Every structure is written in structure tokens, then in C-alpha cells.
Amino acid sequence: MKISESQQLTNFDNSNGPIEIFADDGIEWHKNKSKYVALGNAKALSGTLSVESDKIEAFYKENDSSNMNITEVRAKRNVVVQDKKMKITGGEYAEYKILKDYFFINGKNITLTSEKNILKSNQKLEYWRSKNIAIATGKAEAKKDNEFVILADKLVWYLQERNQKTTVKKLLGFKNVSIKTNNEVAFSDKAIYNNETEICKLYGNVKLQRGESFLIGEYAEVDLRSGISKLLPAPGNKLNENKVRALIDKGGIDTDESNWYSLYCS
């Protein structure tokens, strides 16, 4: 059943607030499948949250009072998700689980932007809106305030709101991690960045590189505020069996530790 041409549909009885659905080419009611389908420039709106795409499907359940409660929204092609904290573009398919306040987005060029922070994926992005957590899987890339770029197979963002601004509280990287700053490149299996300390801890197969010189070990701490990096034996390795080592090119290594590395090894 086609409800209307270029009209809107207002939800019903939803615990997260009313949901309005708009479409240029009409809204269809598929009663047997308990869903509405919005076609052409479709948009679902709830408070500050909006989902836009070429096609939107809204699935609902009826309660004891025969009121309709939308439980899931699916968006297909040219997906854009936006609220006051962030904007997600580049999705080709998205699912929004309303009760969980959770997004699952597929696409080859997904970008989440929050203030000056950017998170990208060429495969999928998951976003827990109420928990302020985003996970990018694929060739994931994160940029923070133009301070550094981190690449990994999987990146986990923890966001926080402070002084009416949204910032990155913590960042985790898994598999094939690389961090690029203006002065150096660091590689590892895993990484944890803490915004409070501005220190990034690297774990497993660590390599700190500047030019043709690099340091190798199992654990490192990169201080993005001071520009000093520490290459250390792996935490908990009391016997220090995994020694750190440096490979230096013909030009030598810069001994100004404010610009280069503080090397700690016993």
C-alpha cells in the first residue's frame, strides 16, 4: 500500500522519541512484513539524529494497544548518518537498532567525522551512539586534530563530550598498526592512545622509524606532546629476554632527544 507522495510518516510509540520518515517518491506500507518503505531522497529523523539514503525501510512491532513501535531502520545506497556529535558518510548499506542505539554500516569509503577527528573504513563501521564508541574494520584510518594518523586492520574509537565539544578519549588499534606524525613513523601489532596523557603505547613487533634509521623491540611509548619516544623491554618481562636494538643509517642518528628518541634498555 502506497501511503503518499512526497509526504512524511510520524511514529507511533517509540521509547527513544518519535521518528519521522520523509520521502520524495512515496512511502509504502508493507503490513504483512511489518515495515514501511520510503523511496527517493528518504530520511528518518528522531531528535538530533537523522538517517538519509535513497531507500529507507522501517521495521515495527505492535504492542498490546496496537500502537506501532519502530525497532529497526535500514538504509540503502548513499547513506548519511548525522547528529550533533558526528557525521557518517560513504555508506552503501546501514542498519540502526533503535533499542541498542547501534549502527552497522557497510561501504568502500565510509568516513566518520567528529569535530577535527576523522575515522575511515573501506569495509564496515560500527557505532554505539549512546556509548560513544565507534569501530572501523578493514583498511581503517584515524586522524586526530591533524596531530597524527593511525592505520590498522581495526580501530576502536572512544569519544567524549567536554566543554560542548566532542573529542577522542581513547583509541585502540589492532593488527598492522602504523602511526604517522610529522617526524616519525611507528609500527606495531597493537596500540593504545590516551588523550589525557597524549601517549600512545605500542605492543608487539614494534619498530620506530625516522628516515633510514629505526629501533626495534616489543614495546614502546610514543609521547605525542613532547615528541619523545621510548623503546622498552616488553611489560612484565623481568628477565628482559627481548632486547631492544637500533639500526642506524650512514648519516647517524639525531642525538637531540627532544626531536628523536629516548632509548631505555638494561
Region annotations inferred by a language model:
Residues M1-S266:
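N-terminal amphipathic/hydrophobic interface segments
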